Regions:
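A short, small-residue-rich loop immediately preceding and capping a beta-strand
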Residues: 36-39, 100-110
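Short glycine-rich anion-binding loops that position phosphate/pyrophosphate groups of nucleotides
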Residues: 10-13, 67-69, 107-110
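Acidic/glycine-enriched connector segments
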Residues: 45-105, 137, 141
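Solvent-exposed alpha-helices and their adjacent loops that cap or buttress functional pockets
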Residues: 1, 31, 74-77, 94-97, ...
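Glycine-rich beta-alpha loop segments
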Residues: 1-60
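Short Gly/Thr/Asp-enriched flexible loops that form oxyanion-binding sites at enzyme active sites
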Residues: 48-53, 113-126
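Short, acidic/small-residue loops that bind anionic groups at enzyme active sites
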Residues: 65, 105, 119-145
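N-terminal alpha/beta PP-like core and its mobile active-site loop of ThDP/TPP-dependent enzymes
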Residues: 18, 86, 98-101, 111, ...
Length: 145
């Protein structure tokens, strides 16, 4: 069974082209190394770029998608596995359950919310969060924290 890496990142289209390229390259590297990628399931922003990188290298990809994203047609169409959940909080729970490690890519408020929840639960000893955590510090994004 492949090791699953949960990647938390942005679906916003208001990210720099260099960050999109970095996300795509990261997805490619994960696929080349044989990791299964679990992420938020979007086809846009750095989420979409990550998925593109994974899929171009014939990697496997699980998208955990809240119903609101289905309605807005933001879903990556070529997912290996698609999990639809009612709410954003359910998405976080599934991402934590399905991942063997967590990577926090530069993102916005949603990513910060996910970081806070994972680290809080990890500090409390929650079983689904007692996994390695990596902050992908692209261009020093996480340095102030």
């Amino acid at each position: 069974m492949k090791t699953s890496v949960g990647v938390f990142l942005s679906a916003s289209d208001r990210v720099s082209p260099s960050l999109l390229e970095e996300a795509k390259n990261f997805g490619s590297r994960l696929a080349e190394k044989g990791f299964h990628v679990v992420y938020g399931g979007a086809s846009c922003g750095s989420m979409g770029a990550l998925a593109q990188g994974v899929l171009e290298k014939k990697g496997t990809l699980t998208g955990v998608i809240p119903e609101i994203d289905i309605l807005q047609e933001l879903v990556q169409p070529n997912l290996t596995e698609k999990i639809v959940v009612p709410k954003m909080s359910d998405r976080k729970e599934q991402l934590m359950e399905k991942s063997d490690a967590f990577v926090f890519f530069p993102g916005g408020l949603g990513t910060l919310d996910e970081i806070t929840e994972v680290l809080c639960l990890k500090s409390l000893g929650a079983k689904n969060c007692m996994k390695p955590v990596v902050f992908y510090n692209y261009l020093g994004f996480w340095t102030p924290f």
